[in-house]
Amino acid sequence: MMLVRSVFRSQLRPSVSGGLQSASCYSSLSAASAEAERTIREGPRNDWSRDEIKSVYDSPLLDLLFHGAQVHRHVHNFREVQQCTLLSIKTGGCSEDCSYCPQSSRYSTGVKAQRLMSKDAVIDAAKKAKEAGSTRFCMGAAWRDTIGRKTNFSQILEYIKEIRGMGMEVCCTLGMIEKQQALELKKAGLTAYNHNLDTSREYYPNVITTRSYDDRLETLSHVRDAGINVCSGGIIGLGEAEEDRIGLLHTLATLPSHPESVPINALLAVKGTPLEDQKPVEIWEMIRMIGTARIVMPKAMVRLSAGRVRFSMSEQALCFLAGANSIFTGEKLLTTPNNDFDADQLMFKTLGLIPKPPSFSEDDSESENCEKVASASH
C-alpha cells in the first residue's frame, strides 16, 4: 500500500488552482521544458525563431532555471566554472559614444586616457592571474578599431604569444578588426576575440550611434573566418525591453555557428555616462537570460560577467545552476569594480565548484595553415 501511494503521489503535481494535475500535463505548460528536451535530444541548432526563444524566455522562472540546469548538466561538467581575468591594456580616450561606457572621451567620468601598457606590466598581470586560478587572460583596448595602430597592434601580438606560452587561453577585445588583422591574431595564438552585440538590433541605436550593428556582425564574421573562437554577448539594464533581450539572444543563436562564449553583463551604471541613472539589474533578470542562453546555445560558455559584484554568493549560485559556467575574477573589469580573487576562491570552496582547465581546440596544423594564409595575403 505504501508503494502504491508513493507512485501515485509522484505522478501528481499541485496546480496553481490548488487541485492536482498529472506530471505530463504540468510539464507541457513550459516551453523551456519542451525546448530543453529537444536540445538534449537533437543538439544545437541555428534555426530558432524569435517566437520560440520568447516562449523559452517567458517560461515560469523556476521551470526555466530547472531546464537550463538539465541542458547544462547534459552538455557540460556542471561543477566546472572557468575563471577569466580581463585587463584594460589601453584605457580611456575612446572616440565612440557607447552610452554605458566610462572610457568614452565624450563623457566626464574621471577616466583618463592612457597609453598602451608595457609588455612587462601586461605579462606580470597575466602571471598573477594564473597564480590566482585564471585560465583565460583577456586584454581590452578602448579603441573604435585597429586601423592606423600598426605599432600597438604588433605589440599586442607579442603579448598574445607570450601569454599563450604560459599555458593560458588568450582573448582580446580591441574594437573592429579587418580580415588581415584577424589572421594575424590567429597566427599569434589568440584563442578568442570578444565583440559584443550589446543588445537587439532594434534597440541598438538608442545605445550607440558611432558603430553600426552590421559593423559588429562583420567583425564577428572576420573572427570566425580566421578560425578564432567567437566571444559575443550583451548587456542588460540599458533601458531595453524584454523583447530586446530576446532579440539579442535570437541574433546570437541564429549565427551560422553559435559563439563559443556568450558573456551576459549586468549594467554597472557609471556617473557621468548617459545611463548613470539606470536602476540595477535584479538577479531574476540574469537567471532568465542565462537559462534561456543555455537552452538555445547549449555548447557555449555562458559567462557571468560585469555586474556580478552586486550579487551575493547565493544569487550567483542560482546563475551557475541555470547554466553559467564562467566568471571574470579580479579587482576590476576594465575600469569597473569586480569580485576579487580571494572572494571567488571562497565561493568556489563553499559551492563545491571546480576550476575549469584551459581548452585549446586548435591543433598545430590549423595554426600552420592559418600562418600560410596570413603570409600569402601580405
UniProtKB/Swiss-Prot annotation:
Its cofactor is [4Fe-4S] cluster; [2Fe-2S] cluster. SMART domains: BATS, Elp3. Transmembrane segments: none annotated. [4Fe-4S] cluster binds at C94, C98, C101. Keywords: 2Fe-2S, 4Fe-4S, Biotin biosynthesis, Iron, Iron-sulfur, Metal-binding, Mitochondrion, S-adenosyl-L-methionine, Transferase, Transit peptide. Coiled coil: none annotated. It catalyses: (4R,5S)-dethiobiotin + (sulfur carrier)-SH + 2 reduced [2Fe-2S]-[ferredoxin] + 2 S-adenosyl-L-methionine = (sulfur carrier)-H + biotin + 2 5'-deoxyadenosine + 2 L-methionine + 2 oxidized [2Fe-2S]-[ferredoxin]. One of its GO terms (biological process) is biotin biosynthetic process. Pathway: Cofactor biosynthesis; biotin biosynthesis; biotin from 7,8-diaminononanoate: step 2/2. GO terms for molecular function: 2 iron, 2 sulfur cluster binding; 4 iron, 4 sulfur cluster binding; biotin synthase activity; zinc ion binding. Binds 1 [4Fe-4S] cluster. The cluster is coordinated with 3 cysteines and an exchangeable S-adenosyl-L-methionine. Binds 1 [2Fe-2S] cluster. The cluster is coordinated with 3 cysteines and 1 arginine. It is an enzyme of class 2 (transferase). This is Biotin synthase, mitochondrial. It comes from Arabidopsis thaliana (Mouse-ear cress). The lineage of its organism: Eukaryota, Viridiplantae, Streptophyta, Embryophyta, Tracheophyta. The gene is BIO2.
